[in-house]
């Protein structure tokens, strides 16, 4: 090592000047006095604590969690009002029965599409027109919104019975998004 760079050079002087020398006779008595005057027992607080706001906070958190779980279950099991308006309900309401007797010829009447379109709601009409135009059902491409957690960036929209000027304005405004 280079001269004058010993890390222990000045340490000895500090210990010599600051350390107190004790007599060997009093050492045991001094240590006993030191440990008898121990204040560690006063550091522990054995008194009963008041529950206070922590209980109220816990109850608030529990109530919030319960409400969230109930909301989740309601969202899971409650039918949306649109489910009762489906194609099956409106088409099955008009069931065609053909009476047949023994030996008679069974004939099933072919109901034209125009009769179905006239008899049922506009929604069924629009869904049927979509299926005829695209060879796939609108409900196969889409689903009812249930939660934000399962969102997709792909959008499917069906427009029917809109004015030509509205259609042109939608085409120009949605061109950047499609």
Curated annotation (Swiss-Prot):
Catalytic activity field: Couples ATP hydrolysis with the unwinding of duplex DNA by translocating in the 3'-5' direction; ATP + H2O = ADP + phosphate + H(+)
Which GO MF terms does the UniProt record name? ATP binding; ATP hydrolysis activity; DNA binding; helicase activity
Question: What keywords were assigned to this record?
Answer: ATP-binding, DNA replication, DNA-binding, Early protein, Helicase, Host nucleus, Hydrolase, Isomerase, Nucleotide-binding
Where does the protein principally reside? Answer: host cell
**Matching SUPFAM superfamilies, A to Z?**
Origin of replication-binding domain, RBD-like
Q: Name one GO biological process term.
A: DNA replication
Q: Where in the cell is it found?
A: Host nucleus
> According to the UniProt entry, what is the EC number of this protein?
5.6.2.4
One GO cellular component from the entry?
host cell nucleus
Q: Does the keyword Isomerase apply?
A: yes
Q: What functional role does this protein have?
A: ATP-dependent DNA 3'-5' helicase required for initiation of viral DNA replication. It forms a complex with the viral E2 protein. The E1-E2 complex binds to the replication origin which contains binding sites for both proteins. During the initial step, a dimer of E1 interacts with a dimer of protein E2 leading to a complex that binds the viral origin of replication with high specificity. Then, a second dimer of E1 displaces the E2 dimer in an ATP-dependent manner to form the E1 tetramer.
Report the protein name in the record: Replication protein E1
